[in-house]
Amino acid sequence: MAVKRRRLLEKLLERRSRGRLHFTLIDPDKTGPGEAGEIAARAAEAGSDAILVGGSIGVTFEETDGVVKAAKRSGLPVILFPGGHTNASRHADAVLFLTVMNSDNPYYIVQAQILGAPLALKLGLEAIPTSYIIVGYGGAAGFVARARPIPYEKPELAALHALAGAMMGGRIIYLEAGSGAPKPVPPEAVAASRKLVDAAGYGGEVLLTVGGGVRTPEAARMLAEAGADVLVTGTLAEESPGKLADVVEAFKSA
């Protein structure tokens, strides 16, 4: 089966031209299909635009597939957010085909992509080139990927990684503080990344995405005002579903 070519990406870019986007992340290692279906339904009601499915540790094909199928019932597009080439499902709409820009491990820079490319082709998944940049806390993603997280107080380093990611073909530039991070990616890092990416002429072609550590409407609003196109939250949907709609609204209305 041929790989789907940018159909979902083009829809997301078109939707971004009308307003900011929010994605809800579900980790199959922590969430079974039953709960995943409930989280996805709540996310749709709260105004989320897509569901990301993936995790950094010990996720199997079967776990991923079950969660993807459950999340699809929400009516939202489901995008794989793989921690490795085993995080796959033919029922997903697309996969973030990501490179960890600040990893010291060749596996996460290119080897996982080589292993994952034929699988994406076989499953007919749309591959969305994604430059993944781990900032500050980093969480499990930073540890597993052997990343050198960008220090919170060095926004210019985040911006250089974002610019390089765009120049290397990334269509999603993802600044990640890590699941359960004590604080989000600094707005200064988002603003600096936005400025460089736009100056290089990639502004309308990429989605500057931020995730990790966002728990309040105020934090979401600050990231929006700094220039983020997409906000990703995961822990919030699992632990504080009542706050999700407020965070989504704050991000989209800023």
From Swiss-Prot:
Biological processes annotated in GO: glycerophospholipid biosynthetic process
Stored Gene3D superfamilies: FMN-linked oxidoreductases
Keyword Metal-binding: yes
MF (Gene Ontology): magnesium ion binding; phosphoglycerol geranylgeranyltransferase activity
CDD domains cross-referenced by the UniProt entry: PcrB_like
Pathway named in the protein's UniProt entry: Membrane lipid metabolism; glycerophospholipid metabolism
Cellular compartments per GO CC: cytoplasm
Sequence positions that bind sn-glycerol 1-phosphate: 174-180, 212-213, 234-235
UniProt-annotated location(s): Cytoplasm
Listed EC numbers: 2.5.1.41
Pfam families xref list: PcrB
InterPro entries hit by this protein: GGGP/HepGP_synthase_I (IPR039074), GGGP/HepGP_synthase_sf (IPR038597), GGGP_HepGP_synthase (IPR008205), GGGP_synth (IPR010946)
Residues reported in the UniProt entry to bind Mg(2+): 27, 56
Main location: cytoplasm
Essential cofactor(s): Mg(2+)
Keyword set, alphabetical order: Cytoplasm, Lipid biosynthesis, Lipid metabolism, Magnesium, Metal-binding, Phospholipid biosynthesis, Phospholipid metabolism, Transferase
Catalysed reaction equations from the record: sn-glycerol 1-phosphate + (2E,6E,10E)-geranylgeranyl diphosphate = sn-3-O-(geranylgeranyl)glycerol 1-phosphate + diphosphate
Subunit structure, as described in the record: Homohexamer.
Chain's role: Prenyltransferase that catalyzes the transfer of the geranylgeranyl moiety of geranylgeranyl diphosphate (GGPP) to the C3 hydroxyl of sn-glycerol-1-phosphate (G1P). This reaction is the first ether-bond-formation step in the biosynthesis of archaeal membrane lipids.
Family the entry assigns: Belongs to the GGGP/HepGP synthase family. Group II subfamily.
Name of this protein: Geranylgeranylglyceryl phosphate synthase
